[in-house]
Amino acid sequence: MSSFPTRVVALYPYRSSFSDDLEFDPGQVIDVVSNLDGDWYTGTYVDSDGNRKIGSFPKDFTEPAEDAVFVERASEMALHQPTPTSAVHSRNSSLGYAPSITRSIKSISNNTEHLGADTESYLSANDFIDSTSEALTKIVDVDTLSAPFGNDSNSRPHSLKNVEKLHTFSAPYTISEETPSCSTENDSLPLTATHTITGGEDAATGAAVTNTTTTHITTSTNTSTVIPSNPNSVFLVDCTHSQCPTDLPNIATTQHSLRYLDNASASAITVLERTHPAASSTMATESSHQSPSADSQAEELSKSQRVAKDDDPFVVSNTANSDEPASSSKPAKPLTDLNRAFSQRLNLDPQKPGKSQGEISEQEEDEYDDAESDEMHSPYSTHEPESEPEDQDEPSEKDDENKDVEEEQEQEQEEEQIDPEEAKRIALRERMAKMSGGIGMHVFGLPGLAAPIGRKNTLRRTPAKSSEEAKSTTNDSSPPKDSSSTSTQPTEQSNAQQAPSPKEEERPLPSEPSQNQPAEYRDTPDTPRNIMPLPGLMSADQPIKVTEPSNDADKAIVAEGPNNEEETKGPVIPETQETSEQQVHKTPSPEKQKVLSPPPIITNFDKETLASNEAHEAVPQKPSAPQVTRLMAPQDSSSVVTPSPTSLLDPARAVRKVIDGIDPPKEAGAGATADVESAANSPITPPRTWHSPDFTSKSFEPIERKLPSRISEVTEDSIDEDKQNEVDPSTSARALPPPGLRFGKVDTLASLAHDDLDDLPAVPRIFSPPPLPKTPSGEFGDNEFMFPKKSNRVRGHQSRPSTGSQLRNVVPVSIVTSGGRPALPDEMASPSSSIGHPLPSPPPADFNSLNVDFYEPHSYLESPAPEPQPSYEEESFNATVIHAPTPSTATFQGHPTISNVATPPLKQDVTESKASPVADASATHQSSTGLTQEITQLGSNMRLPTKLTRPSNDGRKASGPRPAAPPSIPPPLPVSNILSSPTSEPPKDHPPSAPLSKPVSTSPAAPLARVPPVPKLSSKAPPVPLPSADAPPIPVPSTAPPVPIPTSTPPVPKSSSGAPSAPPPVPAPSSEIPSIPAPSGAPPVPAPSGIPPVPKPSVAAPPVPKPSVAVPPVPAPSGAPPVPKPSVAAPPVPVPSGAPPVPKPSVAAPPVPAPSGAPPVPKPSVAAPPVPAPSSGIPPVPKPAAGVPPVPPPSEAPPVPKPSVGVPPVPPPSTAPPVPTPSAGLPPVPVPTAKAPPVPAPSSEAPSVSTPRSSVPSPHSNASPSPTSSSMASAAPARTSVSRSKSKAERHETSTSSRKSSKSGEHHHHHNEGHADSSSTRTSLAHQDSRKSLHRHLSRSSSRASKKPSIVSTTGPFNESFSAKPVEPCASEKWWLNSTAVPKSVVQMNDSVLYMIKEGITGQDKKYKSVHILFPDYSQTVLTATFNPHNQNITQLSQLQLAPPAQPSKARLDEEYACYGSTILKKARAYQGSMVGDGSAFTFVNSVMSILAHNLEPINKQTFGGVIYKNVGNVTVQQIGEIRPGDIVTFDKAKFSGQKGTLRSKYSLEVGKPMHYGIISEWDVSKLKIRVLEQGRESKKVSVASYKFGDLKSGEVTVWRVMRRSWLGWN
C-alpha cells in the first residue's frame, strides 16, 4: 500500500510521445485518479477548451496541492492483475533441479534489446518464477514490449503499464503430457523432438492453442495440439527434467538466450544442409509415430531448412543436433568451428555424423553402416575405392567453391561466439607472443590449456572437456563399434587438425602395426616443444634416435625407428590396437586417412626461411616413430636431447630467466609452470629484437639481470652441462629449446654499457625487488642483501645503514633510561671511525670522558643474534649501559653519567641526584658535552626518528625528546654552573641561577673610621635621570650603602660586647610629622645584626641617587633628638632598570658635621615598620593585620634604612648615640615642610610603579628597607594602596634575589643573632599572608571608595576568515538589565546583521543575557553578560565567535522546500504584472519573504538561506541540491552572451550592476535554463525573464533555498 495526494500542481511542463500519457504545463492542477508503480500517477484535468484529459504522468513533475488529501491505495498492477498462481500449473516433482533450468526463447521480433529486461521485470514483479515447477510457460506480447522507450523520463514503467495486454489467453500453458519435456532420444537427433506446449482457449476466438510454429518445428499429430493464431509471441520454456544436459551454459538474461539460440540455430541448420537424404528418411522413420507421413515430414523439414537458412530464426536449443552421412547427390560440406563446437557440446563425434557415444542403438548403427557403404560407392562422394588410395587426398570441387563463404561465416560466428573475457586473454597472449619474437605462443598457451593453434574454437559458450573425458575420447582412426576402447587426442590437437592449412598435404596412415612401447620424453623439431607421448602407443624397446640437424633451413631433427621405409608429414596418431593382422590387412576409410598436421614452430628468424613456403610445412619423419603433439609443462633439465644454439633464442627462456632471476621457484618442476603462467598473464613483457642486449650477435646467449632476491645457486656441473649442450649456430638454423629451463647467473649489470641498460627487458612490477643500497665501491651489495650479518639489535629498528664506515664493527651500545626516550641503535661510532659519517667525530678527549669499554669486532660478528631479552646482562658480550635521567623531573638533577657494567656502584640514582650537590661543575659539563656530542652523532648516523632533548630545569615537565647539539658546537652551560667560579660573572640576559649548596665567598667591607668621599660609580652603570614632578617615588632596594660617619665618630663595634649600656634620649618629633603606619602588604624588616659586605654592583644595575634622596629622615619619638644625616657621604644606591625616576627633593639634607663629639648613629632595638610603596589609587592604609609587628614605641629610635643591592649598608651601632646639640656645631636635621613635592593623587591614568623583585625586601633579610625620600615619607597620605602589576618573571627574580640576600645576610651578620632571630621570625610570619590580606583589603576599600560596577570583559579567539567580528560591549549602558535592550554598537549595524536575544538563569543569583549577532556569511558573534540581579555591580562580559553552519543535506533542503517553496511561488505569481513597493528587485523578494514565519530573513541584501547552486563565470560550478520553483536567485555582475530564438540570434545581457534578485518560476534541466519572476531590471512591474546558465560569461549567479531558523540553532 502506498499513499498519494488526490490533487497535484504541475511544476514542469511534461510532453510525451505516447498517446495515453497526460501532457500538461506548469501550474496545471491535476486530479489524481490512481497511483502506478514506479512513481507514476494517473490523473485528469479539464483544459482551457473545456476538454477533459486523462492519462499517466510522472509524479516528479508535480507537487501536492495545498488542498490535497493523501489516501492509501494498492498499486494498479495488484488491483487489476490476477494472482500468479492462475498463470502457472506446476508439479512438485522436480525439487532441487532449479539451478539446472535452461531458458530457450523463440521470437521473430526485431526489437530484442528491451525484450529481456521487460520480461524479467514482469516475471519478477509478478513472482511467477517458481523453482518447484517442472516447466514454466509464459506468453508476453512482443508488440507491446518492443515499443520504443519515452524520451522524457527514465523511470517510466513500460512493463508494468502494459500488463493488461499480457493475458490475451484465458488459460495457462503447460507442457503436454504425451511428449516428455526433455528426452535423451530427442537430444541425439536434430529437430525431431518437438515440445508441444498446450493450453486453453484463445480469449478472442475461443479455440485451443498450442505454442508451436510450423515453419520451424515439426508438430505432432496429437489431437490436443493446435497451432496458435497469434505468431507474434514469446515462449519461455524452462527445462527442469532430470535427463536434461547439465553442461549447458547458464544463461542469465533473455538477451543472452537469444544470442545463444541464434548461434545454435545457425550451426544446426548448417549441419542439416550437409546431411544425407538417408538421414532425412531415418529421421522421418524415427518420428513416424508422431507424424502421419514421413515424406511429408521430410518435405516440410526441407522447407523449414530453406526458410531457416534465409531468415536465420531462433531454434529451441534443447533439440539435439547431429551430423548425418553425406548425401549421394550432394558433396559433403566440412564442419565449421561453430558446428563442431555445438556437436561436441552434445557429445557427438565431429568426424562421424549421427554418432553419439554410448547412446546409439543397434538399429541406428546399422543405418549408419548402410549409409556409409552407400557413400563409399556413390559417384559424387569424395571417398575413392580402396584400390585407388593415391587420389583420395584431393579436395573436392564443392569445397573449393564454398571455401570463401565458409571463411566468412566462420569469422562472423567467431566474432559472435568469443567470450569477452576470453577475447581479452587471447589479445594479451597474442601481444605477448608477438613481443617474444613470434614463437612465444606455444609457451603462453600453457595456462588454462588453451592451444595457440585454432584457439578461437575453444572459446565458445560451451563447456570444455575435462581431463578424464579428453583421455577417454578417441580419434577417427578406430571403427565405430570399438568406441568404448578408443581414445582421442587433446582438444588442442583436435582443433588444430580440424583447421588445416590449404597447402598441407594429407597422407594415409602407415599400414604397419604399432606396438605398445613406452618411450621417454623427447622433442621434435616440427611440433611444439615439450612433447609427451601418450601411454600405450610405443613399445618399450623402440628407441627414438635423434640425428644432428643439417645446415638447411627447411630440415630439422628426424626421429628414426625400426622401420625406415616410408615417410609422412606431421604428427602420426596410430590406431588403437586390436590385432596386428587386422591393422596390416585392413585399409582405413578415407575419413580416417585425413590426418592433418599442425603448422611447425619457426625458430629461425632468417627472412629467406620465413618467405619460403617450405617453412610452413612439416618435416618428414619415419612412420615407425610415433609422435604426439600434446603440450606439456617444462620438465627437469635431465633431457638427453642435444640443444642447438638457436634454442637459446627462444623468448620463453629469456622471459623465464628474467623472471626467475627475480623470484625463482623453490622447486624446478612446480615453479616453472607457475612462473610461465605468471609471465603469460603479465602485460609488461617487452619486445625482443636483434638489437636488444638480451641476445648477443655472436654467442646467442641471453644476458640476464643479477638481482639479489633469492637467486638460486647453480652448481658447476649444471654450468658445464649447459656449455656442453651449446652447439655452434652454423650447424643448424632450426632447433627446439631443451625441455627443462635452467636458471643461472650469467653476467651482471656492471658488464653492460650504460646505453645498453636502457634496452634491458622490463620486469613486471609485482616482481620488482626493493631498491638496493649502494656500497662505497658502487656495486650492489648482493652478498650483504642475501646474507645479512646477524647482530644483536635493539628492538624497534627495521633497517640497517649500508655505508662503508666502521659502524658494523663496533659494539652496539644499549641505552637504559628511566624516562620515555627511544633507545639508540645497535651501532656506535668509535673515535677513529669518521669515514662515511654525516657529522665529524667528537674529539678524543670528550670521548674518553665517556668511560666506554669496547670489545673486539670479531666477537660481535661471529656471535649469533640471540633473541631480544628484557635484561642486557645475559648477553655474551660486554654491553655498555648508559643511564640517563628522566626528562620529566621537576628540578635539575645533574647530568647523565656513564658507568661501566663492571662498576655498578657508580650508577647514579634519580632520587639521590636531587639532593646531591654538584661537586665539580666544570668536569660535569665536560662529560655532558662529550655525551651530548656522542649521542648526537649516534642519532645522526643511525637515522633516529626522534632527537634527544635536554631535561627541563624550570620546574615544569619536560615535553618532547631532548634536543641534540652539533658536535662542533658545545651545549650551553647548565644552570647550576653559572656561578661556579668566584670570579666568573653571570652572562648577560641570563636568568638568575639556583642557590648553591655552599655560599659564595665574598670579602666583607671594613668599617669606616671617617667620612669617606663619595665613591665613584662604575663605568657600566648609567646615571639615573632626574625624575619629573608627576612621577611617584620608588622604594629603595633591600640593601643600601653604609652611611658615612664623621672622623670624630667612634667606630662601630663588630660585636654586641662593645655596645653602649644605654641609648641616649631621643627628642620628640614635631607635630607636623605623622607617624608611618605599617601596611599589611609590606613585611617589616628586622634590624641588621651586622655589617654586610659591599658586593660588586651588577652590570645591569643602574646608579642609585644620592642619600639625600634615597635616605629619608628617621622619625623620632618625642624627646629624642633628630638623627643627623649626611648629604654627600653615602654612595649612590643602584636603582633597577624598570623603576621610574626618583623625584628630586625640594629641601636638601644638610651635611653631616664632623666634630669630635658627634654622637654615633643611634641603633634601634626593634625593627621599624616598612615604608609602603606608592600606588595609583593610594587608598588609606588600614590597620596592620595579624602577624604584622606593631609600630615601635616612641622611646625607641627608628631603624636605619638599608641601601640597595650592591651598596654596603649603614653599620649601625649597638646603642643609640647621643643627639648632638647646637653648641657642638651640628645643625639639626631639618624636618620636611610643605615645600616637599606632594604625592600625586590616585588616578586611572597614573602608571603604577612596578618594582622588580630584586628591590623588594626579602623575608629573610636582616636589613630594614629605607624609604624613598624624606619628602615622600612626610607627605605620605593617611591611606595608600599597593599595585599588584607584577609579572611572573618579576616574582621569579624577586624570589631568587631574596634567597641570595638571605644567605648573604646570614653569613655576614651573625654577630647580632638575637635581633636577627626575632626579626626573621616576625618577618616570616608576616610574609605568609601579606599578599592575600592586602589584596582583600584593597578590594574592600576600593568598593567602599567608589561605587562603580566591577565589570570583567573577556573576548575569545576570532577567526579572520569569517565575517563575525568583536563588537563594543558598551558596559556603561547596562543593557543587560533590560530584556529588550541591546548594545548601541549592535543597533548601529542596521540591516547588515541580524541578532537574537537569549536570557536565562545559570544558578542561584546568577542570570545571563546573550545577544547572537548573525553576519552575512552566517557566522555569529555571541555577546554574553552574566550578572547578579540583586547586586548589579558585579558583572562578567564575554564574546565568542561561532563558525557558519554546515552545508545542509539534500534531505534537509527538501524539507525546507516543502515548508516555503509552494508559498513563495504562489505569492510571487500573485504579484505578476503589478509593481511591489518602490519597484526595485529587492523590495519584491523581501515582500514575498515577509509573509513567511520562522525563516531567516535576508542579511545585508546578500544572503537568503542555504546555497543550492553557485556558478562563477562557468568556471566554478557548485550544485548541492535540485533547483526548484520558489527558490531565490541573485545575480552579481553577471554577463550572459549566446544565441536564442528559432533564428538563433545573438544576444548579450548584463545583470547585477547593482545586485539583482528574483524568484525562480520554472527550471529546465536539459537546457540549464531558468525562468525568473523579477522587477526593477526592464520595468518596475513584476515580469518573467529567462536566463541560461550555459551562456554565463562572467559574474556570479547563486540560487538560494529559504531556510528555517532552526538551521542555525535559533529556536
From Swiss-Prot:
<feature type="compositionally biased region" description="Polar residues">
    <location>
        <begin position="923"/>
        <end position="940"/>
    </location>
</feature>
<feature type="modified residue" description="Phosphothreonine">
    <location>
        <position position="1380"/>
    </location>
</feature>
<dbReference type="InterPro" id="IPR035552">
    <property type="entry name" value="Mti1_SH3"/>
</dbReference>
<feature type="compositionally biased region" description="Basic and acidic residues">
    <location>
        <begin position="421"/>
        <end position="433"/>
    </location>
</feature>
<feature type="region of interest" description="Disordered">
    <location>
        <begin position="275"/>
        <end position="648"/>
    </location>
</feature>
<dbReference type="GO" id="GO:0005829">
    <property type="term" value="C:cytosol"/>
</dbReference>
<keyword id="KW-0597">Phosphoprotein</keyword>
<feature type="region of interest" description="Disordered">
    <location>
        <begin position="886"/>
        <end position="1365"/>
    </location>
</feature>
<dbReference type="GO" id="GO:0032153">
    <property type="term" value="C:cell division site"/>
</dbReference>
<feature type="compositionally biased region" description="Polar residues">
    <location>
        <begin position="799"/>
        <end position="808"/>
    </location>
</feature>
<feature type="compositionally biased region" description="Low complexity">
    <location>
        <begin position="1340"/>
        <end position="1350"/>
    </location>
</feature>
<feature type="compositionally biased region" description="Pro residues">
    <location>
        <begin position="1076"/>
        <end position="1241"/>
    </location>
</feature>
<dbReference type="Pfam" id="PF25459">
    <property type="entry name" value="AIM3_BBC1_C"/>
</dbReference>
<feature type="modified residue" description="Phosphoserine">
    <location>
        <position position="1266"/>
    </location>
</feature>
<feature type="compositionally biased region" description="Polar residues">
    <location>
        <begin position="1351"/>
        <end position="1362"/>
    </location>
</feature>
<feature type="compositionally biased region" description="Low complexity">
    <location>
        <begin position="472"/>
        <end position="494"/>
    </location>
</feature>
<dbReference type="GO" id="GO:0051286">
    <property type="term" value="C:cell tip"/>
</dbReference>
<dbReference type="GO" id="GO:0030036">
    <property type="term" value="P:actin cytoskeleton organization"/>
</dbReference>
<keyword id="KW-0728">SH3 domain</keyword>
<dbReference type="GO" id="GO:0030479">
    <property type="term" value="C:actin cortical patch"/>
</dbReference>
<feature type="modified residue" description="Phosphoserine">
    <location>
        <position position="1258"/>
    </location>
</feature>
<feature type="compositionally biased region" description="Polar residues">
    <location>
        <begin position="316"/>
        <end position="330"/>
    </location>
</feature>
<feature type="compositionally biased region" description="Low complexity">
    <location>
        <begin position="637"/>
        <end position="648"/>
    </location>
</feature>
<feature type="compositionally biased region" description="Pro residues">
    <location>
        <begin position="1022"/>
        <end position="1053"/>
    </location>
</feature>
<dbReference type="InterPro" id="IPR036028">
    <property type="entry name" value="SH3-like_dom_sf"/>
</dbReference>
<dbReference type="InterPro" id="IPR051864">
    <property type="entry name" value="NCF2_NOXA1"/>
</dbReference>
<protein>
    <recommendedName>
        <fullName>SH3 domain-containing protein C23A1.17</fullName>
    </recommendedName>
</protein>
<feature type="compositionally biased region" description="Polar residues">
    <location>
        <begin position="1317"/>
        <end position="1327"/>
    </location>
</feature>
<feature type="modified residue" description="Phosphoserine">
    <location>
        <position position="1261"/>
    </location>
</feature>
<feature type="domain" description="SH3">
    <location>
        <begin position="3"/>
        <end position="67"/>
    </location>
</feature>
<dbReference type="Pfam" id="PF00018">
    <property type="entry name" value="SH3_1"/>
</dbReference>
<dbReference type="InterPro" id="IPR001452">
    <property type="entry name" value="SH3_domain"/>
</dbReference>
<feature type="compositionally biased region" description="Acidic residues">
    <location>
        <begin position="361"/>
        <end position="373"/>
    </location>
</feature>
<keyword id="KW-0963">Cytoplasm</keyword>
<feature type="modified residue" description="Phosphoserine">
    <location>
        <position position="1379"/>
    </location>
</feature>
<feature type="compositionally biased region" description="Polar residues">
    <location>
        <begin position="886"/>
        <end position="902"/>
    </location>
</feature>
<feature type="compositionally biased region" description="Basic residues">
    <location>
        <begin position="1300"/>
        <end position="1312"/>
    </location>
</feature>
<feature type="compositionally biased region" description="Basic and acidic residues">
    <location>
        <begin position="300"/>
        <end position="312"/>
    </location>
</feature>
<feature type="region of interest" description="Disordered">
    <location>
        <begin position="762"/>
        <end position="851"/>
    </location>
</feature>
<feature type="compositionally biased region" description="Low complexity">
    <location>
        <begin position="1242"/>
        <end position="1278"/>
    </location>
</feature>
<feature type="compositionally biased region" description="Basic and acidic residues">
    <location>
        <begin position="605"/>
        <end position="619"/>
    </location>
</feature>
<feature type="compositionally biased region" description="Pro residues">
    <location>
        <begin position="963"/>
        <end position="974"/>
    </location>
</feature>
